[in-house]
């Protein structure tokens, strides 16, 4: 039941995310922002709220059973709202982090508001995501078909007052205020817009299932993590940006010379130019360009233009601008994690997307004398002058980052290219290391070892896999052994003799374990097979061998037919069978390996509900069954579909759309959700033990602790051991699972373990 709560909504003004250009006499977006992007969306709410120009235009709020009230600067304080908070009452907002930031950094110091207790806040946006609805209020209102909706004209009114304007000859003002003469009607429209947002937020909240106590507990911890933020190396970011700007200018000049004046960013014109040179592309996004560059017999000039587009359009190096623009005054990035951003409950990232950072830089060698990295084409180490040693192993290591940043500090593109070759690749390799511990602090990080593989093995009861994890065997090697028939002892002997893994580990075991666990076929294998040495028939053989070795996992995916379509029989089993039964028979629960499937009429509407071992629920709205149209469908086979919000054009139409699913994908959702529940439990345990999390990335947790000298003589760091022990402590529903954290490290800069 929804507890009584107040609802509030701020509308604000600020020049944050704008910069004045004297040459054009206009406001522009910050450096590196996408064309046309300015303001709050570029700098993020934490930096926005702290900007000296940020102020309140209006606050609308409603206490339970009361009409909507308004407060604006210059009016008497909203003491009834203060009294509600003082009595322990809860206040809800849509994206409550923004309201909390404005309250804390504008209203408390400037207007004497009391502190806002975080534990008394609720967020209807987070609740929407937990319920698998879209987060944006306008979209949420449309999906829920609310009788009161977000005012479509409000954006015009907000833009009139909330951001600076470009002066004209007839009107030299750079700001328009609601209190300016002649603004009465539009000002009232803005205040009414804020009132309506409060009403829409309340209506949406009434239609959604509230967060469970368990969900709310972790949401509050996520709020803590976002409020705390993570430190960044701001000077090094600016050094990298200086080199990046030079590289972009250089590549831009080359592109103009090759194309007759076109910039790499002019997508439509560049597509036309490429078409004229025999290269037809519907998109110039990174995936499309990468695919095109694999083609043979391409016009050399067109290939070079595509290479330039790939370099300049790299999303990884553009993270630098986001880090610079979103940094707070204490050189920390905040509010980077979106709670329950994915259907499974896993987070998604904001701004520089810390959940998706590049892992590697250029392939360098380390000087045996001074230990510093350089291009393997040099005859001598450019750092110390010692002659190069043939046969040194090429690659990228986290230890290289400080040395690369040392050269970046010269801000010389030529010098960076001399030492490391591709400057943009060198920058990309450093981005992870630009996230740092704060002054006087260290980072400690560790990640789970193959946690999804452990989860699916335990769910399915695949005993040889469970035994392998309990014996701490390498699952990639164990899987390769099952597929190829080569004994595990042979692989281990190879490793002892050669000092490196057998090639089958990467060529066979890795793509099998990463690509096949959720029903993947040839394309799924190839995503993870960097060697690309097998034909489709060979890959198909590997997949069949993997499946033959993992019958319990295949059973877990489930299906609707036993045997071949021409001589089998209908039977619903596993996750797919349970989902179909639940949809077909509302009100009944169907259990598979402790996972419950049922169809119920939830506050937001009819939905398929999957209840995990933890008790957390996954929601699939308006789930339906239809006759399957896939090739080789078994007699009477049904397909499952549900309604969801799609914001990625790669997956089809945008908006509230119907998507299909099947046993393998349901297994993927369930396994990822359970793995995330384990990570949540660990974060709560670390918090209780005094290890505050600054970042969590799927299977990894990063905490920040006071610095201390390195342990002497290779003695293990007790704090790393403690972090990993807490991470390996399982909740009651996963007792005895062979989950372990490994590869822990301690240091000043973030790196891949």
Mark where each language-model region is.
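Conserved RNase H-like, two-metal-ion catalytic cores of nucleic-acid enzymes
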Residues: 1-135, 329, 345, 360-362, ...
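Conserved "right-hand" nucleotidyltransferase catalytic core of DNA-directed polymerases
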Residues: 1-41, 51-60, 143-149, 157-427, ...
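Short Gly/Ser/Thr- and Asp/Glu-enriched loop/turn motifs at secondary-structure junctions
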Residues: 121-122, 218, 265-269, 507, ...
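Active-site palm subdomain of RNA-directed nucleic acid polymerases
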Residues: 208-218, 678-701
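Conserved catalytic core of nucleic-acid polymerases
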Residues: 279-280, 376-380, 481, 486-689, ...
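Conserved catalytic alpha/beta cores of large enzymes that bind or transform nucleotide phosphates
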Residues: 396-451, 470-484, 489-510, 514
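Short beta-strand-to-loop capping motifs
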Residues: 703-707
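Short amphipathic alpha-helices in soluble, non-transmembrane regions
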Residues: 716-728
């Amino acid at each position: 039941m929804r507890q009584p709560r107040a609802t509030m909504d701020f509308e604000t003004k600020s020049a944050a995310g704008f910069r004045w250009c004297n040459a054009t006499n206009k406001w522009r977006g910050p450096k590196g922002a996408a064309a046309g992007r300015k303001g709050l969306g570029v700098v993020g709410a934490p930096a926005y709220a702290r900007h000296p120009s940020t102020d309140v235009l209006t606050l609308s709020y409603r206490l339970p059973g009361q009409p909507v009230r308004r407060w604006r600067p210059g009016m008497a304080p909203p003491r009834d709202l203060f009294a509600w908070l003082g009595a322990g009452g809860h206040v809800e907002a849509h994206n409550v982090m923004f309201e909390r930031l404005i309250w804390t950094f504008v209203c408390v110091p400037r207007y004497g508001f009391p502190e806002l207790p975080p534990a008394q806040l609720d967020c209807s946006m987070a609740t929407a995501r937990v319920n698998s609805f879209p987060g944006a209020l306008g979209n949420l209102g449309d999906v829920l078909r609310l009788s009161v909706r977000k005012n479509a004209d409000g954006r015009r009114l907000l833009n009139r007052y909330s951001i600076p304007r470009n002066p004209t000859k007839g009107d030299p003002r750079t700001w328009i205020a609601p209190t300016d003469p002649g603004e009465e009607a539009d000002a009232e429209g803005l205040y009414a817009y804020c009132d309506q947002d409060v009403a829409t937020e309340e209506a949406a909240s009434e239609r959604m299932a509230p967060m469970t106590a368990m969900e709310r507990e972790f949401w509050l911890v996520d709020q803590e993590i976002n409020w705390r933020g993570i430190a960044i190396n701001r000077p090094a970011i600016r050094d990298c940006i200086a080199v990046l700007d030079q590289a972009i200018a250089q590549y831009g000049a080359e592109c103009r010379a090759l194309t007759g004046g076109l910039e790499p960013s002019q997508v439509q014109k560049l597509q036309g130019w490429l078409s004229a040179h025999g290269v037809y592309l519907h998109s110039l996004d990174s995936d499309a360009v990468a695919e095109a560059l694999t083609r043979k017999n391409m016009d050399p000039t067109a290939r070079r233009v595509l290479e330039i587009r790939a370099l300049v359009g790299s999303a990884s190096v553009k993270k630098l601008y986001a880090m610079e623009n979103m940094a707070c005054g204490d050189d920390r990035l905040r509010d980077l994690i979106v709670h329950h951003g994915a259907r499974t409950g896993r987070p998604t990232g904001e701004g520089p997307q810390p959940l998706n950072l590049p892992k590697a830089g250029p392939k360098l060698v380390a000087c045996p004398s001074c230990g510093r990295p350089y291009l393997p084409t040099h005859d001598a180490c450019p750092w110390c002058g010692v002659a190069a040693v043939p046969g040194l192993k090429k690659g990228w290591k986290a230890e290289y980052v400080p040395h690369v940043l040392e050269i970046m500090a010269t801000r010389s593109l030529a010098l960076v290219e001399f030492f490391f070759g591709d400057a943009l690749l060198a920058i990309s390799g450093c981005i992870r290391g630009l996230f740092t511990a704060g002054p006087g602090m260290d980072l400690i990080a560790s990640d789970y070892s193959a946690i999804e593989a452990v989860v699916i093995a335990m769910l399915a009861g695949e005993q040889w896999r469970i035994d392998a994890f309990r014996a701490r065997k390498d699952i990639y090697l164990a899987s390769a052994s099952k597929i190829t028939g080569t004994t595990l002892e042979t692989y281990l002997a190879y490793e002892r003799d050669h000092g490196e893994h057998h090639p089958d580990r990467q060529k066979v075991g890795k793509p099998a374990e990463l690509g096949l666990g959720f029903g993947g076929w040839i394309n799924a294998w190839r995503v993870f097979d960097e060697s690309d040495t097998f034909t489709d028939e060979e890959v198909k053989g590997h997949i069949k061998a993997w499946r033959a070795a993992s019958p319990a996992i295949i059973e877990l995916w489930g299906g609707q037919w036993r045997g071949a379509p021409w001589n089998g029989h209908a039977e619903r089993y596993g996750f797919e069978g349970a989902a179909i039964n639940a949809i077909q028979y509302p009100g009944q629960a169907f259990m598979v390996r402790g996972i419950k499937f049922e169809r119920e009429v939830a506050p937001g509407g009819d939905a398929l509900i999957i209840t995990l071992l933890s008790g957390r629920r996954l929601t699939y709205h308006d789930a339906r069954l239809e006759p399957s149209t896939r090739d080789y469908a078994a007699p009477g086979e049904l397909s499952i579909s549900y309604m969801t919000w799609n914001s990625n054009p790669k997956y089809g139409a945008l908006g509230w759309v119907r998507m299909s699913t099947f046993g393998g994908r349901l297994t993927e959702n369930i396994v990822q959700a359970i793995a995330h529940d384990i990570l949540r439990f660990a974060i709560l345990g670390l918090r209780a033990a005094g290890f505050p999390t600054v970042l969590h990335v799927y299977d990894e947790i990063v905490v920040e602790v006071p610095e201390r000298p390195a342990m002497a003589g290779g003695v293990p760091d007790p704090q790393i051991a403690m972090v990993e022990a807490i991470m390996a402590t399982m909740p009651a529903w996963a007792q005895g699972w062979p989950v372990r954290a490994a590869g822990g490290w301690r240091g000043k800069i973030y790196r891949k373990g």
